[in-house]
């Protein structure tokens, strides 16, 4: 598998490190404004089977154009897309395979599967999503928190509430509280709290290093490389991992 890494910040560097450890061939690194690596996708002239993108939303048009023109699958793990940009990704997926997720860890894929099963059973419980990240993270709430919120909304009629300071009223049963914590060097922590009468249930995922996201991105690349055009997500990553586990058993 020949991988192109698009975006060579902290995550891009870890993807390269993990790829080499797994024996995956990194044929190109594209880092806009870099003197050390290729500056633009248009300059790439080596074999590429799949692109792993940890860049920023401003580079999305060039990324989608590159994938479409060269018929190359894309793993898009960049965060902070607008609804319009997500729509552009979906449109492009009609022509090429695209895996898009704000979180590429298997643990979050598993957490989403647990929510799909648990949320329908929690009528009468108030649900809150709490996420914590390092002090340098700009967007809030995190893309992963939004992903979890969408999973909950799909199973219960709730509405995300992002602040309560200005609300002088009791919590409604249809509310889905969203909370963000920023500080220190926290890699990423997501908790879904189900608060009932006299009891609470918590589902929690904690990333202990960024390698978990690199491993997931490479697994996603391997998952979609031979797939038909379409939009793939964490559910596909979970299904693939489960299939491999069953084969080993």
Swiss-Prot record:
Recorded metabolic or biological pathway in which this protein acts: Amino-acid biosynthesis; L-lysine biosynthesis via DAP pathway; (S)-tetrahydrodipicolinate from L-aspartate: step 4/4
Signal peptide annotation: none
Classification lineage: Bacteria, Bacillati, Bacillota, Bacilli, Bacillales
Organism: Exiguobacterium sp. (strain ATCC BAA-1283 / AT1b)
Organism domain of life: Bacteria
GO biological process, alphabetically ordered: diaminopimelate biosynthetic process; lysine biosynthetic process via diaminopimelate
Protein's name in the database: 4-hydroxy-tetrahydrodipicolinate reductase
CDD domains per UniProt: DHDPR_N (cd02274)
Entry function: Catalyzes the conversion of 4-hydroxy-tetrahydrodipicolinate (HTPA) to tetrahydrodipicolinate.
Binding locations of NAD(+): 77-79, 101-104
